[in-house]
From Swiss-Prot:
It is found in: Cytoplasm. Transmembrane segments: none annotated. Peptide chain release factor 1 directs the termination of translation in response to the peptide chain termination codons UAG and UAA. Its main location: cytoplasm. One of its GO terms (cellular component) is cytoplasm. GO terms for molecular function: translation release factor activity, codon specific. Keywords: Cytoplasm, Methylation, Protein biosynthesis. The modification N5-methylglutamine is found at residue 235. PANTHER family: LD18447P (PTHR43804:SF7). Pfam families: PCRF, RF-1. This is Peptide chain release factor 1. The keyword Protein biosynthesis applies.
Length: 357
């Protein structure tokens, strides 16, 4: 693998460090955070790349010792052993660099909405909603994240029909995005006198916090028509072409303003109305996409559509996507979710690396 293009990383990192001390950048939080992220990303890449280059040079040095007939036999043995270790390390570093270079999910840095809803299973499902929310809250605490409940529908039994929270902090979406889907619980309800195991299901949706929709109107996409204002019954109330009709060609939205006697004022009003209508249309489409994302994430809440099973009698947690089984249910429910999340991240990275090959 050729990494020649990384030789200029030191200069780029130095340039970014200069930006981080620029008052203009510091006062622009959005730009400042962007520079901070790039600096952290390139610094990590640079550290691994330098170790990779050093290992490659060490390989060449050890090969030279092995091919030198005049070298001490003991030194050659050491060089041979070190060469084997170096070759393994180079493969590891090569993979590490590729992982760092994998395309980033643009949502990874965003704060995240956690939505948990009771599916099949009645009261048991509602109780498990509360259990999962506690699990995610405790995990968030260990990560230094902030959890803010946005809405909830509590039931008298101590569970929830649904609960929605905003989780804020570093890399929230990158860690929690693998939690979307149906979570199945198998346990004996407290009200069960026969000791039978009941199976219930809960849906979890993980949605990145949407940034405010910014609207830019291209004036070349607008058609302006002017005409005389008309009053009740259609009679003309103005002798000049002061009324304005604006058509937004891409969407077909039409706005007419004729309240003012001035064509300029009617045009300004019409543009204001058009902007509001376009913004509403964009936000409606955006919300429709969010709804579709939620539906595709969580399925129907049927017990058979599970991504993970929590079996209380066995103390077992199984993630069906990667065939991971851990007999640490109590620990995981207590917030040690990293034991499940990090194997999922590793699996995801491996799949993406396969796609690059």
């Amino acid at each position: 693998m050729l990494f020649d293009k990384f030789d200029d990383l030191d200069n780029r990192i130095e340039h970014l460090e200069g930006k981080l001390s620029d008052p203009e950048i510091v006062n622009d939080q959005k730009e400042f955070q962007k520079v901070v992220r790039e600096h952290a990303h390139l610094s990590k890449l640079n550290t691994v790349y330098k170790e990779y280059k050093t290992a490659c040079q060490d390989v060449e040095d050890n090969k030279a010792i092995l091919h030198d007939d005049g070298e001490d036999p003991d030194l050659k043995e050491l060089a041979k052993a070190e060469l084997e270790e170096l070759n393994v390390r180079i493969v590891e570093l090569d993979k590490a660099i590729k992982i760092i270079l994998l395309p980033k999910d643009p949502n990874d840095e965003k704060n995240t909405f956690l939505e948990i809803r009771a599916g099949a299973g009645g009261d048991e499902a509602a109780l498990f909603v509360a259990d999962l929310f506690r699990m995610y809250t405790r995990f968030a605490e260990t990560m230094g994240w902030k959890v803010e409940v946005m809405s909830s529908n509590p039931l008298g039994i101590g569970g929830f029909k649904e609960i929605i929270a905003l989780i804020s902090g570093e890399q929230v979406f990158s860690k929690l995005k693998y939690e979307s889907g149906v979570h199945r619980v198998q346990r004996v309800p407290e009200t069960e006198t026969q000791g039978r195991i009941h199976t219930s299901a809960v849906t979890v949706a993980i949605l990145p916090e949407a940034e405010e929709v910014e609207l830019h109107i291209d004036m070349n996409e607008l058609k302006f028509d002017v005409f005389r204002s008309s009053g009740p019954g259609g009679q003309s109330v103005n002798t000049t072409d002061s009324a304005v009709r604006i058509t937004h060609l891409p969407t077909g939205l039409v706005v007419i303003c004729q309240d003012e006697k001035s064509q300029h004022k009617n045009k300004v009003k019409a543009l204001t109305v058009l902007r509001a209508r376009l913004l509403d249309k964009l936000e409606s489409e955006h919300n429709a996409k969010i709804s579709e994302a939620r539906r595709s994430q969580v399925g129907t809440g049927d017990r058979s559509e599970r991504i993970r099973t929590y079996n209380f009698p066995q103390g077992r947690v199984t993630d069906h996507r990667i065939n991971l089984t851990l007999y640490k249910l109590e620990t995981i429910m207590g917030g040690s979710l990293d034991e499940v999340i990090y194997p999922l991240i590793t699996h995801d990275q491996a799949e993406k690396l396969k796609d690059l090959e």
